[in-house]
């Protein structure tokens, strides 16, 4: 059995209880890693500054560290006791920085090396999910020599083409004809050596934040996303005031529960910890949910979804940030899985 909707209020109560009894001095000097070098740098800066402000508002000795402007070896000079990772995409969400922090013996928020490396690769992620019997759209890895007609015959139209290691919809194209495939591939290949095409599931776009680890992992409330013109691109994700977020979703309770169960199984299959967010499509014809991606370092901007779900469970932004950081107190050296 999975810990889903029925435990939401108790999760919120446990968070409040744990924070009430926390000695902030035990957190020591905290580094907030932000910025970085990926295509999601701008969003990382927004997330990181929000996290930094929240921690300081709680009285935590927190300091920004721009991983895109400073040499990682400077982390040693800063004498941080623990790290809050607010990096998104490659070199921040792919196991790279996690491996460095392991070597330095610094506890950090989010998934460890292996889970981070698995989740950043959309193709490997799908392989893990499929091996665990979890529903995800049909896919193919594209190359410059792919047979475009064969791809369409396999996946149907419309289909989605995107870089395998990018997030925030960077380089993503919804392909409606075989003639559009070469250009879509070229766009994605300009950002990544590995490109994936997958069947486009038509229906409701949902996301489900997750917290915890292993047997104690839990799914937070599901959020339904309604972007303008049904286009949830980079701009509409982070800057548009026209994108609607519904929490509660307005869907039947059993549908929400099915999405939470699927998302939690996906989170556990990858070995994620602390927090994450599963993106899901709900097929309008069959009502079946399909897994798209797992985010192991979700955004924490004003438009971000994990804070929204946490608030629905009774936890405000600053308390969520502090609780996530507090999970590093439980980490043991060498926990790379």
UniProtKB/Swiss-Prot annotation:
<dbReference type="InterPro" id="IPR005905">
    <property type="entry name" value="D_ala_D_ala"/>
</dbReference>
<dbReference type="GO" id="GO:0008360">
    <property type="term" value="P:regulation of cell shape"/>
</dbReference>
<keyword id="KW-0963">Cytoplasm</keyword>
<keyword id="KW-0133">Cell shape</keyword>
<dbReference type="GO" id="GO:0009252">
    <property type="term" value="P:peptidoglycan biosynthetic process"/>
</dbReference>
<keyword id="KW-0464">Manganese</keyword>
<keyword id="KW-0067">ATP-binding</keyword>
<dbReference type="GO" id="GO:0008716">
    <property type="term" value="F:D-alanine-D-alanine ligase activity"/>
</dbReference>
<comment type="pathway">
    <text>Cell wall biogenesis; peptidoglycan biosynthesis.</text>
</comment>
<feature type="binding site">
    <location>
        <position position="293"/>
    </location>
    <ligand>
        <name>Mg(2+) 1</name>
    </ligand>
</feature>
<comment type="function">
    <text>Cell wall formation.</text>
</comment>
<dbReference type="GO" id="GO:0046872">
    <property type="term" value="F:metal ion binding"/>
</dbReference>
<feature type="binding site">
    <location>
        <position position="295"/>
    </location>
    <ligand>
        <name>Mg(2+) 2</name>
    </ligand>
</feature>
<dbReference type="GO" id="GO:0071555">
    <property type="term" value="P:cell wall organization"/>
</dbReference>
<feature type="binding site">
    <location>
        <begin position="152"/>
        <end position="207"/>
    </location>
    <ligand>
        <name>ATP</name>
    </ligand>
</feature>
<keyword id="KW-0460">Magnesium</keyword>
<dbReference type="InterPro" id="IPR000291">
    <property type="entry name" value="D-Ala_lig_Van_CS"/>
</dbReference>
<dbReference type="GO" id="GO:0005829">
    <property type="term" value="C:cytosol"/>
</dbReference>
<dbReference type="GO" id="GO:0005524">
    <property type="term" value="F:ATP binding"/>
</dbReference>
<keyword id="KW-0479">Metal-binding</keyword>
<dbReference type="Pfam" id="PF01820">
    <property type="entry name" value="Dala_Dala_lig_N"/>
</dbReference>
<feature type="binding site">
    <location>
        <position position="293"/>
    </location>
    <ligand>
        <name>Mg(2+) 2</name>
    </ligand>
</feature>
<dbReference type="InterPro" id="IPR016185">
    <property type="entry name" value="PreATP-grasp_dom_sf"/>
</dbReference>
<dbReference type="InterPro" id="IPR011127">
    <property type="entry name" value="Dala_Dala_lig_N"/>
</dbReference>
<keyword id="KW-0436">Ligase</keyword>
<dbReference type="InterPro" id="IPR013815">
    <property type="entry name" value="ATP_grasp_subdomain_1"/>
</dbReference>
<keyword id="KW-0547">Nucleotide-binding</keyword>
<dbReference type="Pfam" id="PF07478">
    <property type="entry name" value="Dala_Dala_lig_C"/>
</dbReference>
<dbReference type="InterPro" id="IPR011095">
    <property type="entry name" value="Dala_Dala_lig_C"/>
</dbReference>
<keyword id="KW-0573">Peptidoglycan synthesis</keyword>
<comment type="similarity">
    <text>Belongs to the D-alanine--D-alanine ligase family.</text>
</comment>
<feature type="domain" description="ATP-grasp">
    <location>
        <begin position="126"/>
        <end position="326"/>
    </location>
</feature>
<dbReference type="InterPro" id="IPR011761">
    <property type="entry name" value="ATP-grasp"/>
</dbReference>
<protein>
    <recommendedName>
        <fullName>D-alanine--D-alanine ligase</fullName>
        <ecNumber>6.3.2.4</ecNumber>
    </recommendedName>
</protein>
<feature type="binding site">
    <location>
        <position position="279"/>
    </location>
    <ligand>
        <name>Mg(2+) 1</name>
    </ligand>
</feature>
<keyword id="KW-0961">Cell wall biogenesis/degradation</keyword>
């Amino acid at each position: 059995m999975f810990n889903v909707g029925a435990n939401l209020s108790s999760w919120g109560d446990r968070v409040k209880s744990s924070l009430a009894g926390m000695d902030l001095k035990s957190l020591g000097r905290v580094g907030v890693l932000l910025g970085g070098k990926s295509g999601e740098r701008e969003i990382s800066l927004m997330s990181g500054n929000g996290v930094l402000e929240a921690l300081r508002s709680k009285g935590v000795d927190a300091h920004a560290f721009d991983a895109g402007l400073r040499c990682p070896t400077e982390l040693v000079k800063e004498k941080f006791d623990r790290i809050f990772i607010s990096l998104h995409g490659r070199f921040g969400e792919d196991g790279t920085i996690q491996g460095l922090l392991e070597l330095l013996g610094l506890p950090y928020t989010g998934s460890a090396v292996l889970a981070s490396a698995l989740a950043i690769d959309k193709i490997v992620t799908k392989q893990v999910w499929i091996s665990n019997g979890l529903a995800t759209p049909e896919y193919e890895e594209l190359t410059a020599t792919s047979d475009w007609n064969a791809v369409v015959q396999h996946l149907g139209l419309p289909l989605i083409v995107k870089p395998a290691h990018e997030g925030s919809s960077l380089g993503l194209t919804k392909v409606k004809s075989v003639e559009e495939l070469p250009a879509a591939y070229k766009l994605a290949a300009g950002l990544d050596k590995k490109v994936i095409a997958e069947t486009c599931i038509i229906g409701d776009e949902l996301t489900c934040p997750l917290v915890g680890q292993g047997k104690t992992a839990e799914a937070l409330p599901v959020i339904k996303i309604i972007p303008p013109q049904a286009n949830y691109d980079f701009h509409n994700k982070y800057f548009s005031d026209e994108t609607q977020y519904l929490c509660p979703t307005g869907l039947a309770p059993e549908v929400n529960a099915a999405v939470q169960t699927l998302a939690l199984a996906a989170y556990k299959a990858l070995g994620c910890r602390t927090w994450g967010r599963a993106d899901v499509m709900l097929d309008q014809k069959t009502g079946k949910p399909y897994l798209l991606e797992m985010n192991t370092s979700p955004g924490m901007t004003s438009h971000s979804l994990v804070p929204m779900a946490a608030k629905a469970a009774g936890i405000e932004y600053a308390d969520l940030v502090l609780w996530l950081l507090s999970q590093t107190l439980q980490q043991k050296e060498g926990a790379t899985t």
